[in-house]
Amino acid sequence: MSRFIVVAPGSSEAAALATDELARVLGVATVDALAGTTATDAALRPASALPAVVEAVRAAGDDALIVPAREASNRAFDHVAWNLSLAASTRAGVVLAFDAEGASAELLSEEIAAARLRAEASAASVVAVVLTGGAPALEVDVPVLTLPLGEEAAATLRGTEAPTAVTPLAFQADLIERARAD
């Protein structure tokens, strides 16, 4: 697997830290989750905004890190939902990021479970969890990584299987790509 996006349901800072670390250890191209659009367009016209971003992500190649969209001045924009939809539509593995400082293992486990349910509802695949600011022992069935990330984390992520769910938008993008190739 080579395409990832960080989704941090509770902390834009955790998303930024995890994204920076992933970009450093993976050494892949980055593409913005709002490439070619704005948060306002994404909130008000997602049916036209999302396909444009999917095309930009696919143009970046199979080895890419999508820099996640974050909170915006337009409060109608749900950055978590956008990032999960983009992950599903581009077959990017979701790396959940949480600020673990001062959080109990029980609370983090509940937050991870809730975020995974939300990802599943969007047809996105969670491939790992990144914790910032401490690392309580967690019992989850995906790799749990802590900052700073090293080569072992990169190898773990590269070894994950690519998501296989096919959303209507991913199917459409596949057809367009094949038509252009012919």
Predicted ranges, named:
Residues 1-128, 133-143, 148-182:
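ATP-dependent carboxylate-amine ligase catalytic core
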